[in-house]
């Protein structure tokens, strides 16, 4: 992920809203993952995979994007049919198309809902790929299972967060992990 400042912002958002979610839902201690979202620990974790992000906008007349990302208007337009890219698992690569979340655009309650959706999506993604393995892990080693969910959130929620000054981009991201 090229923009480390944005990624750190996303990690901090994940930690904040996971903490609120865990408290609000009175989650069991072994299901809580907010404390895992420490920027320094994540940055120093050897071998931790970073997501690949392709930034797109639905607006073909977005002057800001052309000026800043296409070498001062010198670029190409790539048209993609993203209707199938709602999220899925294929050949050990997870991919999702997600709208960016700009700072101060959503209320805390809305962000808690979004992080809960990411938490749920993570659990579903793993259970959907190898149900027997992950059900056994959830039963016998719940903390290990939620670590996988934490990695999912790190891959698919954190890269969505952007600073308000970029709101004009109206950006969505294809995230590969």
Residues covered by each model-derived region:
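Partner-binding and oligomerization surfaces adjacent to conserved cores of proteins
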Residues: 1-177
